[in-house]
UniProtKB/Swiss-Prot annotation:
GO terms for molecular function: ATP binding; magnesium ion binding; shikimate kinase activity. It is found in: Cytoplasm. Its EC number is 2.7.1.71. The gene is aroK. Pfam families: SKI. Catalyzes the specific phosphorylation of the 3-hydroxyl group of shikimic acid using ATP as a cosubstrate. This is Shikimate kinase 1. Pathway: Metabolic intermediate biosynthesis; chorismate biosynthesis; chorismate from D-erythrose 4-phosphate and phosphoenolpyruvate: step 5/7.
Length: 173
């Protein structure tokens, strides 16, 4: 089995970070964290509310602090928020404190996976979701690529299949 080192999942919304992260943690008998869920737990409010009240900048400040604390732990799987990589500090911490896995997917898959999810503040706007996702991809994909140790496409694969691919890649490195 892969040694117990931190595994950090990055990628766009709808790539499957939380679902795959839970599966991966279960298979490796590691503790799982989701940075968005941790923010919700600490604030007692959902991410959308935090965005509405504090704005994206306030949310990103919280996210940076949460990810800093979580990445200091050992032997965890962490699903990060899609925009967490906007922070250079967060990118540096993720790179230094574990293996970064970029879960890549298409805009079409993102649209299919997020269309009924009202907990995506960046999609609760007047612009068409495709345009929002394309703009986010243009901004963030280079940042995911910059820190990724491993990149895996998640398009038509189950969480278990992707988790197994990650485990196999970790064991071969």
């Amino acid at each position: 089995m892969a040694e117990k080192r931190n595994i950090f999942l990055v990628g766009p919304m709808g790539a499957g970070k939380s679902t795959i992260g839970r599966q991966l943690a279960q298979q490796l008998n590691m503790e799982f964290f989701d940075s968005d869920q941790e923010i919700e737990r600490r604030t007692g409010a959902d991410v959308g509310w935090v965005f509405d009240v504090e704005g994206e900048e306030g949310f990103r400040d919280r996210e940076e602090k949460v990810i800093n604390e979580l990445t200091e732990k050992q032997g965890i799987v962490l699903a990060t928020g899609g925009g967490s990589v906007k922070s250079r500090e967060t990118r540096n911490r993720l790179s230094a404190r574990g293996v970064v896995v970029y879960l890549e997917t298409t805009i079409e898959k993102q649209l299919a996976r997020t269309q009924r999810d009202k907990k995506r503040p960046l999609l609760q706007v007047d612009e068409p979701p495709r345009e929002v996702l394309e703009a986010l991809a243009k901004e963030r994909n280079p940042l995911y690529e910059e820190i990724a140790d491993v990149t895996i496409r998640t398009d038509d694969q189950s969480a278990k299949v992707v988790a197994n691919q990650i485990i196999n890649m970790l064991e071969s490195n």
